[in-house]
């Protein structure tokens, strides 16, 4: 189980029920965290990225941002996560674990910077643009979009392009 979900499960079991009622009655600051495993942190304007993510999520029925953890890693780590949790034996750019509740997007997103780099070359785009596409791709999954079924990939790509347009026009 990804680390945030495991911590959440432990807290849920170990803290008294009144604590959770109190939390639900008061605004608790939600977080978007950027973490690394076995790789150097990419340069990001974290404040701008957080605002952009919140703006994109809000375009999907006014969804709010809960707790989002971006875990940047290498290909070896993402392959390990892919095998362990999804039973897939291949590299990918992002794996999203969804812990969302109605109206609030929350989750862990593992991003392989190695795959992002190779995809940027493959798709003739910059590393920065490809990274932003992958970052928002995870949020779009948390907002309910899929990319595996017939026609879903085109819908996802259009949503990514709208979100990237917001990013580059600073409309967030």
Regions found by a protein language model. Give the residues of each.
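An acidic/histidine-cluster motif and surrounding catalytic segment
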Residues: 2, 6-131, 143-172
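Short active-site segment of divalent metal-dependent hydrolases/proteases
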Residues: 136, 140-144
């Amino acid at each position: 189980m990804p680390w945030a979900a495991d911590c959440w499960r432990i807290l849920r079991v170990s803290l008294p029920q009144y604590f959770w009622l109190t939390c639900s009655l008061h605004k608790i600051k939600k977080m978007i965290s950027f973490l690394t495993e076995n790789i150097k942190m990419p340069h990001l304007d974290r404040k701008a990225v957080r605002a952009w993510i919140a703006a994109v999520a809000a375009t999907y029925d006014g969804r709010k941002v809960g707790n989002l953890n971006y875990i940047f890693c290498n290909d070896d780590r993402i392959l390990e996560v892919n095998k362990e949790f999804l039973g897939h034996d291949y590299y990918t750019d992002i794996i999203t674990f969804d812990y969302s509740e109605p109206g609030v997007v929350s989750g862990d997103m593992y991003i392989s910077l190695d795959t992002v780099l190779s995809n940027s070359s493959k798709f003739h785009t910059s590393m920065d643009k490809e990274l932003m596409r992958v970052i928002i791709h995870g949020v779009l999954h948390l907002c309910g979009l899929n990319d595996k079924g017939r026609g879903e990939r085109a819908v996802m790509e259009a949503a990514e392009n709208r979100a990237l347009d917001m990013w580059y026009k600073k409309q967030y």
